Amino acid sequence: MTKCKVIALANQKGGTAKTTTTLNLGIGLAHQGRKVLLVDADPQGDLTTALGWTNADSLPITLETQMKKILQDEPFVYNEGILHHEEGVDIIPTNIELSGMEISLVNAMSREQTLKLYLADLKKDYDYILIDCMPSLGMLTINALAAADSVIVPVQAHYLPLKGMTQLMKTIGKVQRHLNPNLKIDGVLLTLADMRTKLARTTEDSLRENYGKHIRIFKAIIPVAITAAESSAAGQSIYEYDKNGTVAKAYAEFTREVIQCGEKQRNKHESSLSR
């Protein structure tokens, strides 16, 4: 198995299709033969619910219980509590109890590294680990960025969400300087886009003009469609729910771009080591 790549999907702005993107990227990677673990790091538990586990509050083992054991220096089985979805991905589930972890982390030693410590042994079992971050820049998101090799930023195709990019980029920069110097930005993904509208086209132009010289703007654009929400409600990926639709095709294209991005980074790294 090749080296596992950990990707955080982050944006402090809600409503950017971040969870939908995590789910469909993960299952898209599984369709390409990759072993994938999804980490639901949002106390809302939307990723857990979207994969069909509507009883998250009654699950005995979640991300919160495992992180708590690390904080309290208690022994734990690293792969305990992981659930398997019929479309080929595994998930570390979450429920609202994770919200208390923000407070617990504030005064903890090595507080930014707790999630990284948890994922360390899991990495040997997977090609990709995708972390669905909460829509804030609190300690859980900092933990995700500290644990990740790279970050993908989903952005809604409206003007105002672009304004939040500045703060997110500052946070990523701080994490790179102080916690994770190897953290890379894989790119920005435009989501919920109706490219028939002037607003969406203007947003894309603005995104490419302001950030495109320094950051990859993925060629794939995820269109707005009711089928994306319906698939989550059905506990399925968009490929299973509407495999011939525009959203499924867009996510398949995005998945290919992510794989190509990873291969380029790996080849570049191996080339630098051989010099």
Explain the meaning of each model-derived region.
Residues M1-R275:
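P-loop NTP-binding core
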